[in-house]
Amino acid sequence: MKALFVRCYGRLTADMMIGGLIDMGVPPVYLKSCLSDAGITADFMEKLNPAAQISAHYFHIFPEAFEGPLYMVSFMARWRSLCEKVHPEWEETGWKVFRALASGLPEGKDDLSLNGVSMENAVSLYLLLCCLDYLETESLFTIPFSIEKGTSEAARASLAILKSAGATDGEPVPAEDIHPFAAAILEGLSADFISMDGRFLSDKTAYGSSSADKPTGDNTVCLYLGYYTDRAESVFGRHMKVFGANPDLEL
């Protein structure tokens, strides 16, 4: 069973995860074709970070022109329009992320922009799923990490969203460094938050960068693509898949 593990060391955005998947082998021209096929008008920038101490890719979706509050209903309508032409089956996959995202909103509020979420984040999610589909990823897992509280509204949201993050013996990741939409992707799409063990055979390792040119301190998301060998007792039989769900799992 092919799986992707995500390890977060610090700063994390959805675009950084896409950058890591490009570094893993997803061609940027493929992502451009995905946008074209879906009738999506969106521009992005991608480049290898030549100054990084390790191979890392930078990726960034340019902001869409959108003014005023960003309500969940508008965000979901944008998501539906992205999926309907080529991948209508991904609409439900997005709902998993949006449910997690909603848990980070202040009580009685429905404006996603309060948490730093913007309309182009929907395009980031679509391209992330395109990357996972290209790599034939069947399930996504997140390696547990502890989170340090922050003071901003976005930090409060990320902490509220990541209910499953758990804890490790490593340094805690500041909630200020985790974008709420990236937090919702991990919480909504991860089959589980577990450590890699002997069942997982890593085939590729890649990094996403939050900078196109800084040499250190920016390659804080590591992605591992590989296979589970113990299929009889595999977690895959018991947990949500990226593109679908266990029929016994209540969403």
Question: What spans do the regions from the language model cover?
Answer:
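Glycine-rich nucleotide/cofactor/substrate-binding loop typically near the N-terminus or early
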Residues: 23-108, 174-176, 180-183, 196-200
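Alpha-helical support elements that line or immediately flank enzyme active sites
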Residues: 15-27, 84, 126-136
